[in-house]
């Protein structure tokens, strides 16, 4: 599996951070560099129907090597890394045979500590690939890319029986645009798996229902000395709005299947304030109730304002829980779970407290649960991945292809 590590280190050397608020897709030039590199590598491996769309979706096919009516399946990862932490000049550290305790990240004060990240206790003896404390690592989702590419090579080299295997690498997943320009018909798979999860054994087919809430508050500013009965402080109204939002239903207070309201940004002056919330819930009814709650709060706080002052609230749904689509095709999960068990991995079905391209693709007609990559602590300088976890992911991808061929 030396090639697996080589691929991964090659991919993370490219800065592919996506950028929010940009109209073009992909949002950054660095993503194109990785997409063109992957296109070249897929062609060198002999895959067919290798295409790169003008919106940066790369697709290719490993043709079936056995006859029969075997369903075409897909594996998908994204090329961008999170805008939340620098992805420039990533300098990975390789820690072989981890023996426990803190891992120094580079030459500064940053450490990867089992006190803060207890999962490290479960990884003794493994090879960890970490950051140098200055950037993210990019395992999300370049570990997934390296695993898919390596699995393709294994299928070819070991001549493992399989049907048509479709692969796709998408841009701008981290800014919510990855699946918007995905041509499901062109992909032509019966179902697919995103390889974009976390620790070994994770199999995810439930994600949040998600919405964004943008609130515009228009007040009235006058000199504070003569403000009585005239000033309408937009910042005070913003504070009142947030005070009405349930404090125990925030991200830092919730876990598992619990939903939340999250104030992501707030800025303004006396004259004008803007607030941006995200709403998340696994249950569709509770999700709708949360949206109604925000509307009720805005109405309550805005009651009795001068006509020139107002609160404007816009709610936009982002994505929905893919569970309702995936459970219609239980064999997709059955195959993935069997593949894991065949690789001596106990499947861990858990909800995604976030979103994934697979959620949007599932509602576009391509059922698409999420497989693990072996990575942890995404979107920050404490991100790391285990080489053993990546190797297990490759084994599971290969086994899924093999099991699917046996279903003909």
From Swiss-Prot:
PROSITE patterns found in the cross-reference section: ARGE_DAPE_CPG2_1 (PS00758), ARGE_DAPE_CPG2_2 (PS00759)
GO MF entries: metallopeptidase activity; protein homodimerization activity; tripeptide aminopeptidase activity; zinc ion binding
PANTHER family, alphabetized: PEPTIDASE T (PTHR42994:SF1)
Listed InterPro entries: ArgE/DapE_CS, Bact_exopeptidase_dim_dom, Peptidase_M20, Peptidase_M20_dimer, Peptidase_M20B
Record function comment: Cleaves the N-terminal amino acid of tripeptides.
UniProt entry keywords in alphabetical sequence: Aminopeptidase, Cytoplasm, Hydrolase, Metal-binding, Metalloprotease, Protease, Zinc
GO cellular component: cytosol
Positions with a binding annotation for Zn(2+) 2: 140, 174, 379
Free-text cofactor note: Binds 2 Zn(2+) ions per subunit.
Cell compartments where the protein resides: Cytoplasm
Natural source organism: Escherichia coli (strain K12)
Cofactor requirements of the protein: Zn(2+)
Signal peptide extent: none
Residues of the active site: 80, 173
One of the GO BP terms on file: peptide metabolic process
Domain of life the protein comes from: Bacteria
Reaction(s) the record says it catalyses: Release of the N-terminal residue from a tripeptide
NCBIfam families xref list: peptidase-T, PRK05469.1, PRK13381.1
Entry's family note: Belongs to the peptidase M20B family.
Subunit structure: Homodimer.
Gene that encodes the chain: pepT
List of residues binding Zn(2+) 1: 78, 140, 196
Name of this protein: Peptidase T
E.C. code: 3.4.11.4
CDD domains the UniProt entry points to: M20_peptT
Top-rank EC class of the record's enzyme: hydrolase
């Amino acid at each position: 599996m030396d090639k697996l590590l080589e691929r991964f280190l090659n991919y993370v050397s490219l800065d592919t951070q996506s950028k929010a608020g940009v109209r073009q897709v992909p949002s950054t030039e660095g993503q194109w560099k990785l997409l063109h590199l992957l296109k070249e590598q897929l062609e060198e491996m002999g895959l067919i129907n290798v295409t790169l769309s003008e919106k940066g979706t790369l697709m290719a096919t490993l043709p079936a090597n056995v006859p029969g009516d075997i369903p075409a399946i897909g594996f998908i990862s994204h090329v961008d890394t999170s805008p939340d932490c620098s992805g420039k000049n990533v300098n990975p550290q390789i820690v072989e045979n981890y023996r426990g305790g803190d891992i120094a990240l580079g030459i500064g004060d940053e450490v990867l500590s089992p006190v803060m990240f207890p999962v490290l206790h479960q990884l003794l003896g493994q090879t960890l690939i970490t950051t140098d404390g200055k950037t993210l690592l990019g395992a999300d989702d370049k570990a997934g890319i390296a695993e898919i590419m390596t699995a393709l090579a294994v299928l070819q080299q070991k001549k493992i029986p399989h049907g048509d295997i479709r692969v796709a690498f998408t841009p701008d997943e981290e800014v919510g645009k990855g699946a918007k320009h995905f041509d499901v018909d062109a992909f032509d798979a019966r179902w697919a798996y995103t390889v974009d999860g976390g620790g070994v054994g994770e199999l995810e087919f439930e994600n949040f229902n998600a919405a964004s809430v943008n609130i515009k508050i228009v007040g009235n500013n006058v000199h504070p000395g003569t403000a009585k009965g005239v000033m309408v402080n937009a910042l005070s109204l913003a504070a009142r709005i947030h005070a009405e939002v349930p404090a125990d239903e925030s991200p830092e207070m919730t876990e598992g299947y619990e939903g939340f309201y999250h104030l992501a940004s707030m800025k303004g002056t006396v004259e004008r304030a803007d607030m941006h919330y995200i709403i998340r819930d696994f249950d569709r009814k509770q999700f709708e109730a949360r949206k109604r709650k925000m509307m009720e709060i805005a109405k309550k706080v805005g009651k009795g304002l001068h006509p020139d002052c107002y609160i404007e609230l816009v709610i936009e749904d982002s994505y929905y829980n893919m569970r309702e689509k995936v459970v219609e095709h239980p064999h997709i999960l059955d195959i993935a779970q069997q593949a894991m068990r065949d690789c001596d991995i106990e499947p861990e079905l858990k909800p995604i407290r976030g979103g994934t391209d697979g959620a949007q693709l599932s509602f576009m007609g391509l059922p698409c649960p999420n497989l693990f990559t072996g990575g942890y602590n995404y979107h920050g300088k404490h991100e790391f991945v285990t080489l053993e976890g990546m190797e297990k992911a490759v084994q599971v991808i290969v086994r899924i292809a093999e099991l699917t061929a046996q279903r003909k």
